[in-house]
């Protein structure tokens, strides 16, 4: 097939760049322009030079996108929008995250799955596809980063935003189902860029305003697919591989190239292939990781109450309130959103493809994502990091290295399991985010074969860039892109919420009257 052949050629180009970069890093300066620049930079490698330039670009972007409207309170505007939006949706829909929880589980179990409904994947596959993009390194590395930067108190805010984020995700995924486009061949186009454009026009907004909302979201979604959905995953996967084979920095190019090739093998199959892969990977890797975490918590059961007290004290103590309270809150919210993506609209792209003729039903399935991702897995990881004392250990490293240290302190053999989990988490996240970014790319440039091949080639190239970049720059870029998706999505979601509320009231009435057909 032309697509497979072209993707192979693109990968070959990336592979060639990897080998070239690797050889450059291994050799002494030979007088060429790249080598000369490296020599003048005090012996910096090519990868270090690229990382330095990347850091400068990220710095300029952060100054614009993380603007703080109130100088005396250092809270970025986007964090305020996410927090206020999540609280609004929860109250507006009558705490649906609580009263609709059991029904959401029944739907996910397949009780209402009609194989003849329009769509490409089942409710369960839609959930696992979305979870594969969220249950991942945000849970393993992101939690450690939050505690490292914001202290144990950041965990409280991760849980809070996870609970409120459940209803935010319900709103956006319901809208994705309402405004999706089902093509004659059965494929689906859906997500915030579509419901923002169409829905806002139906609310009376001018075409250009509605189109601008969709365009802005699509641009940031593509950036998010390259950042948090790609570079961060590749960076931490590379770190995990280093932990297994030794600190061989010169192999980063090679590791990045191999990861790019493996991701390319799956993404050529689209959402159906992604759904088939994630429905097998996600339950397995979640089970392994949660089981290991529970073993450690049982072994440290006596320290759990003290850890819980420390988390609360770090969040509400007077010195925290008047000192670092805002910083703790911001770090907790940023890491929670990076982990569960509630409010940013990414999961709506996957849930739009689910087989159903009831938009509210898929929205309820989507609610389970933030609960599983943040309230359960992130909290467990945080407790492991705290009870082990890893966040206070100077030699524990950062990100996934800190989590590895925390697990290894109790289970000496666990780093091997964690490294495998990291690779699986990173891999599943990258293949899901490639689909998100590809749909946004198609919204901007069309769905021609050439446009799709170009996006996939760029996506694979960013895997290599993530493998050689520093964690600091990767996290900053990832936060910028993913959090910025919330600007148009939350604002548009609030405007369109009355439509969702009307659909929910109708659905809930029919559910209580036992009007739905079951298939269990």
Language model: regions and residue ranges:
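N-terminal alpha-helical transmembrane segments of multi-pass membrane transport
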Residues: 2-3, 7-8, 12-137, 148-152, ...
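Flexible loop linkers connecting adjacent transmembrane helices
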Residues: 95-123, 145-147, 151-155, 167-208, ...
């Amino acid at each position: 097939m032309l697509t497979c052949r072209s993707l192979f050629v693109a990968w070959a180009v990336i592979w060639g760049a990897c080998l070239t970069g690797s050889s450059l890093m291994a050799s002494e300066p030979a007088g060429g322009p790249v080598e000369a620049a490296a020599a003048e930079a005090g012996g910096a490698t090519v990868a270090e030079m690229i990382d330095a330039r990347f850091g400068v670009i990220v710095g300029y972007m952060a100054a614009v996108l993380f603007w703080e409207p109130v100088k005396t309170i250092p809270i970025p505007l986007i964090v305020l929008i996410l927090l206020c939006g999540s609280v609004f949706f929860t109250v507006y829909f009558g705490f649906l995250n609580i009263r609709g929880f059991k029904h959401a589980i029944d739907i996910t179990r397949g009780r209402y799955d009609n194989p003849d409904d329009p769509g490409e994947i089942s409710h369960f596959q839609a959930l696992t596809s979305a979870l594969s993009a969220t249950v991942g390194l945000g849970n393993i590395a992101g939690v450690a980063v939050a505690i490292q930067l914001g202290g144990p108190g950041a965990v409280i805010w991760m849980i809070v935003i996870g609970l409120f984020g459940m209803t935010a995700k319900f709103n956006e995924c319901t809208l994705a189902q309402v405004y999706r486009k089902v093509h004659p061949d059965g494929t689906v186009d859906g997500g915030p860029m579509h419901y923002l454009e169409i829905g806002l026009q139906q609310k009376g907004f001018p075409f250009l305003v509605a189109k601008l909302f969709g365009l802005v979201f699509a641009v940031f979604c593509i950036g998010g697919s390259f950042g948090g959905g790609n570079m961060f995953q590749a960076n931490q996967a590379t770190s995990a591989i280093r932990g297994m084979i030794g600190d061989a920095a010169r192999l980063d190019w090679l590791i990045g190239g191999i990861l790019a090739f493996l991701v390319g093998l799956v993404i050529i199959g689209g959402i159906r292939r992604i759904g088939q892969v994630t429905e097998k990977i996600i339950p397995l890797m979640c089970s392994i990781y949660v089981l290991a975490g529970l073993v450690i918590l049982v072994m440290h059961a006596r320290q759990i109450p003290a850890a819980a007290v420390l988390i609360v004290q770090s969040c509400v103590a007077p010195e925290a309130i008047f000192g670092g309270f805002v910083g703790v809150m911001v770090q907790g919210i940023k890491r929670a959103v990076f982990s569960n993506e509630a409010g940013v609209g990414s999961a709506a792209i996957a849930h739009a493809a689910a087989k159903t003729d009831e938009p509210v039903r898929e929205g309820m399935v989507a609610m389970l994502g933030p609960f599983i991702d943040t309230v359960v897995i992130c909290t467990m990881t945080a407790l492991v990091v705290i009870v082990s004392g890893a966040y206070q250990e100077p030699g524990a490293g950062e990100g996934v290295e800190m989590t590895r240290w925390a697990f290894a302190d109790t289970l000496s053999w666990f780093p091997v399991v964690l490294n495998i989990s990291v690779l699986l988490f990173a891999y599943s996240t990258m293949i899901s985010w490639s689909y998100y970014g590809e749909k946004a790319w198609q919204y901007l440039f069309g769905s021609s074969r050439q446009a799709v091949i170009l996006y996939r080639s760029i996506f694979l190239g960013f895997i290599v860039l993530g493998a050689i970049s520093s964690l600091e720059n990767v996290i900053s870029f990832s936060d910028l892109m993913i959090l910025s998706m919330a600007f148009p999505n939350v604002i548009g979601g609030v405007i369109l919420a009355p439509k969702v509320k009307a659909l929910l009231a109708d659905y809930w009435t029919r559910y209580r009257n036992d009007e739905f057909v079951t298939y269990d």
